[in-house]
Design a protein with these regions (language model features):
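Short N-terminal "domain-start" leader segments
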Residues: 1-28
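A short, exposed loop/beta-hairpin motif centered on an aromatic-Gly-Thr core
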Residues: 32-47, 53
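Short intrinsically disordered terminal tails
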Residues: 1-2, 52-56
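Generic detector of intrinsically disordered, low-complexity, polar/charged segments
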Residues: 11-12, 22, 32, 39, ...
């Protein structure tokens, strides 16, 4: 299976959100900060995850 392709990235507050396109299926999002990542199926949830990850 081919890894998902990163089709966009938004940097914010010391973290980032990437939009990923799998070989088959729907887009999903990866929110990362401070060495931790969370995955979600919608951008709104990805934004909430990033807010949680960047808190000190």
């Amino acid at each position: 299976m081919k890894p998902s392709e990163v089709i966009s990235r938004t940097d914010r507050d010391g973290g980032f959100i990437e939009t990923l396109q799998p070989e088959r299926g729907e887009l999903f999002y990866r929110s990362c900060a401070h060495g931790y990542c969370r995955y979600s199926s919608d951008l709104w949830q990805a934004e909430l995850y990033l807010d949680q990850l960047v808190k000190p």
